[in-house]
Structures are given as structure tokens and as C-alpha cells.
From Swiss-Prot:
Keyword Cytoplasm attributed: yes
Record key words, sorted: ATP-binding, Chaperone, Cytoplasm, Nucleotide-binding, Stress response
Pfam families hit by this protein: AAA, AAA_2, ClpB_D2-small
Native species: Syntrophomonas wolfei subsp. wolfei (strain DSM 2245B / Goettingen)
Subcellular location: Cytoplasm
HAMAP family according to UniProt: HslU (MF_00249)
Protein name (database record): ATP-dependent protease ATPase subunit HslU
Assembly with partners or alone: A double ring-shaped homohexamer of HslV is capped on each side by a ring-shaped HslU homohexamer. The assembly of the HslU/HslV complex is dependent on binding of ATP.
BP GO terms, sorted: protein unfolding; proteolysis involved in protein catabolic process
Length: 466
């Protein structure tokens, strides 16, 4: 069971996300409350519901990243959906129940990956045994057919003993050769050898054939219903032993899985640990309108309400309850405000967190401090071309200053501005790096100024290029 304290959760999030301590604290508390709830008696546990969160902040300040990193941290089923893509029942578009079905799919996939990892070693052994069978079949049953149909009952004991001795000798000999072959395969000495294997040919997915027809919205698994009616063809493929091991290990591991148990566990995990991130919630928060593009937004809110407050959604794996799913909504709320949501929906998101716009110092820290910082990413990318690159502290400071300046003068897109600035800054290097193998480059403030100043100072250029 997940036992990190709220402080430890925030420290983990700090490795990837700069600032936004209030938002980190809110999600850390929500996560710790799930752990606390699991320790309670059954009667009380059912009565405690998660406190859903609304994150308010402009694009690029870390709303989505906080939720995504949180889910990875606890290995919880997590999906991100855009609220603006849903439509009221009766309009063309996705209905809100599909987010729960997507969560269950994600949860089952997570459980299946864990179960596959648990049986992978056994599956690998079985796969290697199949490869040995292909290379050297174990057939020690060859014997002379009796001429008399009753000879197998009346034949001489001596003749039968001779046949048995010969069969036993051949069986031992083949067994020894198979063991030598098995050891060589296990030591990866025959990886490049080619063998012919039989693999199941996949039939076209029924869900793809009927995509767009709304069949998946009914919670019906046509693939399971009709897939067994289609013949499972096998085709022969010539592959290396390394590739054969991979294919056959997957096949054998699949056979070891109890899919019914995986489906049950996946649904339970989605119900107890699932996180649904509702992005662009502000886009459905506008005032009610009887015509135009806003006509179904109030209806979408009313459709989302029962999902958030707890209901049962029918999926192709079985019913899934949403009572204890954690919902994290997010939006910029530039045009609308949280109070524009219908009151019932506002009440289902009791925790509101405002994320701060990123300052120059925040952008500078984003460039260098996180484990996956942009500077580290570009240095690693160019190192694959045998090109060594480094940035001076002054250059990093100047990049952050220029990115902040563009954000202030044009649309504020937060940390995403750094991506466009860095791409423009390193465009020539990324293009010419294959011809610069072995060189060492230091990106200083002059290099940055030469490539960015003209674009940043020209407001029209910065709007279109950065």
C-alpha cells in the first residue's frame, strides 16, 4: 500500500515541477487521505469520499504535469480528458460516461502489465522450450509397426524389449542434445540464427470496424462476442531466435494470465485509486445560451454531475462505480470564472487552488533544476551526434529573461514558451550537428543574444516565431 507522507509526495513532485507549492500540497493531502481511508473499518470507509480539486491557472504553469506525475508516483490509473470535447446527450460527440470507460481500460492495462511482469520469467522458459522443440523435436516414440493387428498383445516379449531399449537409447541421446541446445539458447549464443515459428494472425478489431457507430458507448464488447466466431489462423514466419523468444514469451505469458481476475482487479483499482483529470473545465463554464456554440455546455455540466458525485457506469468489463474516483479539474478561467459552473458542480469540487504565473526566476529554474529539464534534454540529444554542449549561467539567465519578456508582451503560455525559444536558439546546431561530431560548444550570452534579440524586440516577429 502507498505510504508516502504529504511532505514526501511534495518532495517527489519538486523533482519535476518548479513552484506551485499550494497545488502540490492539495494533491498530496488528497492522496494521503486515500491511504488513510483504506485503514478504516468497512462501514466508515464507504462513507468517506475524495475531496475533488479545481486548479485555476493559465496554460503552461504545471496543472496537467502535477496530476500526471502524481499518478505515476503511485502507479494509479490516470486519464486526462478535455471537458470541451464532451457534448450533451442528443448532440454529436462523446458522452461523459466514456471517461469512466477509458479509466477502466487504463486500469486493466496497468494490472495486466503487472501480471505479465510477474509471469514473464516462466513465460520465457516456456518460450525457450518451444524454440528447442522447433530446432530439435523430442520424438523417441518411433517403433516398428506390428504386421499382425493383435501383435501388440501377443508379440514376443524379447522383440518388445529390443524396441524399448532402442527407443530409450534414442530418447536419452536426444535429451542430451536438447539440453546442450537449451543452455546455448539460454546463454544467448544463437540469437542471430533464423528459425520458422507459427504465430496467431490477428483478425481486424471489431471495435475499429464499428468505430464511430457508438457501439462502444453501450458498453458492449463486440470483439469478445464475435471474435470467437472468426477462425484463428496461424501463419508461419521466419525470424531470428531473439525475435522468436520475444514473440513466444508474450504468447506463453498471455496463456498464464487469468483475464477474468485481471478485469475484476482492474475495475476495483479504477474505483478505489483512479484519477480523472478534467482539463478545460472553464470552456463549459460559460453562461447558458439557447443557440450558437454554447448551446450544450450547461447540459454537459449536468451530465458530468452524476459521474462526479458517484454513479455506476456500465463498461464492457462490468459495472464500475465512480464514488471514490478522484476528479481534478483544471482551467485558465480567463473569460469565465468558477462561479459560472452550475452550483451543484461547484459543490462537488470543494478544494480550489490558484496556480501562479511563472516569473523569470521560475523559468530559469525550469531550464536547469528538474530531473528532465530542457537543458539536460538538449545536451543529451546532441550527445548522440558526439557533440558536447554546455550553457554558461549567464546564457541560461538571458534565455529565461527573454522567454519571460515574450510571455509578458504577448500571450502568457508559461513554461511552454521555453520550448519555442530553445528550438529557435538551437535550430542551426540541431541541423548541422551531424557534421560537427567531436566538437565542444559552449553556449554563452553572446550566442543567445545574436539569435534571439532581433526576434524578441520585434513584437510582430515574436508573435509569429516565438
Amino acid at each position: 500500500m502507498f505510504k508516502l507522507t504529504p511532505r514526501e509526495i511534495v518532495e517527489e513532485l519538486d523533482k519535476y515541477i518548479i513552484g506551485q507549492q499550494e497545488a502540490k500540497k492539495a494533491v498530496a493531502i488528497a492522496l494521503r487521505n486515500r491511504y488513510r481511508r483504506k485503514l478504516l473499518p468497512d462501514e466508515l470507509r464507504e462513507e468517506i469520499y475524495p475531496k475533488n480539486i479545481i486548479m485555476i491557472g493559465s496554460t503552461g504553469v504545471g496543472k496537467t504535469e502535477i496530476a500526471r506525475r502524481l499518478a505515476r508516483l503511485v502507479k494509479a490509473p490516470f486519464i486526462k480528458v478535455e471537458a470541451s470535447k464532451f457534448t450533451e446527450v442528443g448532440y454529436v460527440g462523446r458522452d461523459v460516461d466514456s471517461m469512466v470507460r477509458d479509466l477502466v481500460e487504463t486500469s486493466i492495462r496497468l494490472v495486466k502489465q503487472e501480471k505479465m511482469a510477474a509471469v514473464e520469467q516462466k513465460g520465457r522458459q516456456m518460450a525457450e522450450e518451444r524454440i528447442v522443440d522447433i530446432l530439435l523435436p523430442f520424438d523417441g516414440r518411433k517403433s516398428k509397426s506390428p504386421k499382425n493387428p493383435f501383435e501388440f498383445l501377443l508379440g514376443s516379449i524379447q522383440e518388445r524389449d529390443d524396441v524399448d531399449d532402442e527407443s530409450e537409447r534414442r530418447r536419452r541421446e536426444i535429451g542430451q542434445r536438447r539440453e546442450i541446445l537449451r543452455q546455448k539458447i539460454n546463454r544467448l549464443e544463437l540469437e542471430d540464427e533464423t528459425i520458422e515459428i507459427e504465430v496467431e494472425e490477428k483478425n481486424p478489431s471489431f471495435m475499429e470496424i464499428f468505430s464511430g457507430s457508438g457501439v462502444e458507448e453501450m458498453g458492449i464488447n463486440l470483439q469478445d462476442m464475435l471474435g470467437n466466431l472468426m477462425p484463428r489462423n496461424k501463419k508461419k514466419r521466419k525470424v531470428s531466435i531473439a525475435e522468436a523468444r520475444r514473440i513466444l514469451t508474450y504468447e506463453e505469458s498471455q496463456r498464464l494470465l487469468d483475464m477474468d481476475e485481471i478485469h475484476r482487479e482492474g475495475i476495483k483499482r479504477a474505483e478505489e485509486d483512479g484519477i480523472i483529470f478534467l482539463d478545460e473545465i472553464d470552456k463549459i463554464a460559460s453562461k447558458e445560451s439557447n443557440y450558437g456554440p454554447d448551446v450544450s455546455r450547461g447540459g454537459v455540466q449536468r451530465d458530468i454531475l452524476p459521474i462526479v458525485e458517484g454513479s455506476t457506469v456500465i463498461t464492457k468489463y462490468g459495472p464500475a462505480r465512480t464514488d471514490h474516483v478522484l476528479f481534478i479539474a483544471a482551467g485558465a478561467f480567463h473569460v469565465s470564472k468558477p462561479s459560472d459552473l452550475i452550483p451543484e458542480l461547484q459543490g462537488r469540487f470543494p478544494i480550489r487552488v490558484e496556480l501562479e504565473s511563472l516569473k523569470k526566476e521560475d523559468l530559469k529554474r525550469i531550464l536547469t533544476e528538474p530531473n528532465n529539464s530542457l537543458i539536460k534534454q538538449y545536451i543529451a540529444l546532441l550527445s548522440t551526434e558526439k557533440l558536447t554542449m554546455d550553457f554558461t549561467p549567464e546564457a541560461i539567465d538571458y534565455i529565461a529573461e527573454r522567454a519571460y519578456e515574450v510571455n509578458s508582451r504577448t500571450e502568457d503560455i508559461g513554461a511552454r514558451r521555453l520550448h519555442t525559444v530553445m528550438e529557435k536558439l538551437l535550430e542551426d546546431l540541431l541541423f548541422n550537428s551531424p557534421d560537427m561530431a567531436g566538437e565542444k560548444l559552449v553556449i554563452d550570452i553572446d550566442y543567445v543574444a545574436e539569435r534571439l534579440d532581433r526576434i524578441v524586440e520585434d513584437e510582430d516577429l515574436s508573435r509569429y516565431i516565438l
